Swiss-Prot record:
This is Urease subunit alpha. SUPFAM superfamilies: Urease, beta-subunit, Urease, gamma-subunit. Pathway: Nitrogen metabolism; urea degradation; CO(2) and NH(3) from urea (urease route): step 1/1. It comes from Helicobacter pylori (strain J99 / ATCC 700824) (Campylobacter pylori J99). In the N-terminal section; belongs to the urease gamma subunit family. In the C-terminal section; belongs to the urease beta subunit family. Heterohexamer of 3 UreA (alpha) and 3 UreB (beta) subunits. Four heterohexamers assemble to form a 16 nm dodecameric complex. Residues 1-102 are annotated as: Urease gamma. Residues 103-238 are annotated as: Urease beta. One of its GO terms (biological process) is urea catabolic process. The gene is ureA. One of its GO terms (cellular component) is urease complex. Keywords: Hydrolase. GO terms for molecular function: nickel cation binding; urease activity.
Length: 238
């Protein structure tokens, strides 16, 4: 017997549906996969029998499972079930919308938000820094990037920004077009303040000694706005 990948998928779906049906008969609450498999397998079988139309099966698919037949939260996870079923006159897509009515219980992962605004970084002291893009390409800086180590074509007082990041919402960014100059608000990086990666100017605990080393590195590597003491002495192995 030679089967196409599509036929193998349908056999697997039928097997999963039968397993789900047996568990339902035993009173076992179905999970997401089992619920979808049971509905899909039933529709395939009824379509193959040829006694019901696609429209009738769409309605029937909403009566197969009740909220108490599935685990808490499963009903809200299944917004629709779509299955390509073989009818006597050809293959048709049967889509069952909201196959299981919600039972009013809490949905796993559901968020309840307050109506008022949320103040980000509340209580953290911010400093304002004027930044200019002296390069010929746009530069975009993410919310948690160590601002001291941003693109070397951004000109600003780098010493003032050591150990700081943008005071903006997580996941957002600030963009500087070529020649653009504007001020940004920065706050201290939280946590244990061990800064690694970025442009490898720090790669250690962010303290005063690290700042001296980082400023020297930045000046050597051509980062605009980096001013290092000409009498710099390597007191710590870099």
């Amino acid at each position: 017997m030679k089967l196409t990948p599509k036929e193998l998928d349908k056999l697997m779906l039928h097997y999963a549906g039968e397993l789900a049906r047996k568990r339902k008969e035993k009173g076992i609450k179905l999970n997401y996969v089992e619920a979808v498999a049971l509905i899909s397998a039933h529709i395939m079988e009824e379509a193959r029998a040829g006694k019901k139309t696609a429209a009738e099966l769409m309605q029937e698919g909403r009566t197969l499972l009740k909220p108490d037949d599935v685990m808490d939260g499963v009903a809200s996870m299944i917004h629709e079930v779509g299955i390509e079923a073989m009818f006597p006159d050809g293959t048709k897509l049967v889509t069952v919308h909201t196959p299981i009515e919600a039972n009013g219980k809490l949905v796993p992962g559901e968020l309840f938000l307050k109506n008022e605004d949320i103040t980000i970084n509340e209580g953290k002291k911010a400093v304002s820094v004027k930044v200019k893009n002296v390069g010929d390409r746009p530069v975009q800086i993410g919310s948690h990037f160590h601002f001291f180590e941003v693109n070397r074509c951004l000109d600003f007082d780098r010493e003032k920004t050591f150990g700081k990041r943008l005071d903006i919402a997580s996941g957002t960014a600030v963009r500087f077009e070529p020649g653009e100059e504007k001020s940004v608000e920065l706050i201290d990086i939280g946590g244990n303040r061990r800064i690694f990666g970025f442009n490898a100017l720090v790669d250690r605990q962010a303290d005063n000694e690290s700042k001296k080393i980082a400023l020297h590195r930045a000046k050597e590597r051509g980062f605009h706005g980096a001013k290092s003491d000409d009498n710099y002495v390597k007191t710590i192995k870099e």
